[in-house]
A protein has these predicted regions:
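Short boundary/linker motifs that mark transitions into or out of structured domains
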Residues: 1-37, 92-103
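Conserved RecA-like P-loop NTPase ATPase core
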Residues: 19, 40, 56, 81, ...
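Glycine-centered, phosphate/nucleic-acid-interacting loop/turn motifs that mediate DNA/RNA or nucleotide
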Residues: 85
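Active-site phosphate/pyrophosphate-handling residues
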Residues: 38, 55, 173
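Non-catalytic DNA-binding core/recognition domains of DNA-processing enzymes
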Residues: 74-82
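Short coil-to-helix segment of the ABC ATPase nucleotide-binding domain corresponding to the Q-loop/switch region
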Residues: 48-60
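Intrinsically disordered, charged and Pro/Gly-enriched terminal/linker segments
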Residues: 26-30, 34, 42-48, 65-72, ...
Length: 264
């Protein structure tokens, strides 16, 4: 009789790939090498559908036409993955072969970090829009923390780049949520630091510059806020040949008026 598992598995695809269930953990050192790591990550990400074997091969080897007997090699990788998952209560059906496809199935309630980050971001942004900052910090912090970790470090490929781009977007938006919460709580230096993180990651994202300018001004640093505006304007002109948006210009105009009023 098999072990009775009390918890659904947790799958970490960022950082070091790790699977946890109850008190049992399997990390990527148990996966069948670099190719096994790529195959597992791809099958987890695409588990909502059967994935054609040639698509899995492309994800594993990064080429549409792997050399040699690639179908045999891929079958061996999948067999080793099944063996790796067995200590966590997965049977051979966890990665099923059907009609020229592979499909990975996780038990009900399984938690996958990349997906959890997206859900947490949606929750945080909803709280920010509804002006519930106290409820936004937790999920925004979860999203930012997960999205900051590397995905398949040392590997590359179109699908890997897409996942990384999604994580980067999640992190940037989560940092914006955290900055909004900090501003709402009157923690203006923290809000400015978080907004600076946003513009460092995405320098053409004007909402980040706007948050930075407002946070600096609200913290009593109007000159620094105008300096941030000048930095934004110079970047836009040099790299894109455009001026900042009317909203950004409006914030700068308000800051100039406030500075003029204070010196009158």
């Amino acid at each position: 009789m098999g072990k009775a598992w009390t918890d659904a598995p947790r799958v970490y695809l960022t950082g070091r790939i790790t699977l946890e269930r109850d008190r049992t953990a399997v990390d990527e050192r148990r996966l069948p090498g670099r190719q096994g790591r790529r195959a597992f990550a791809y099958l987890v990400m695409e588990r909502a559908r059967p994935v054609p074997i040639d698509e899995v091969a492309l994800a594993v080897w990064g080429t549409a036409e792997p050399s040699g007997a690639w179908e045999t090699a891929l079958s061996a990788i999948v067999s080793k993955l099944r063996a790796t998952l067995k200590p966590l209560g997965f049977d051979a059906r966890a990665i099923a072969a059907e009609s020229g496809c592979y499909r990975l199935t996780l038990p009900a309630g399984a938690w996958v970090d990349v997906e959890a980050a997206r859900r947490a971001l949606d929750e945080a942004e909803g709280h920010v829009r509804a002006r519930r900052p106290s409820q936004a910090w937790g999920p925004a912090n979860v999203a930012a923390s997960i999205a900051e970790r590397p995905f398949l470090a040392g590997d590359d490929g179109e699908w890997i780049a897409r996942v990384r781009a999604g994580l980067r977007d999640t992190r940037v938006r989560a940092l914006e949520c955290l900055a909004a919460v900090a501003s709402a709580n009157g923690e203006h230096p923290l809000a400015a630091r978080l907004a600076r993180d946003v513009v460092d990651l995405e320098p053409f994202r004007e909402t980040g510059w706007q948050r930075l300018m407002r946070a600096l001004a609200d913290g009593g640093n109007r000159a620094e806020a105008l300096r941030a505006y000048a930095e934004c304007r110079a970047l836009m002109a040099k790299e894109l040949g455009v001026a900042p948006s009317p909203e950004t210009e409006g914030i700068a105009s308000t800051l100039r008026g406030a500075r003029a009023g204070s010196s009158a």
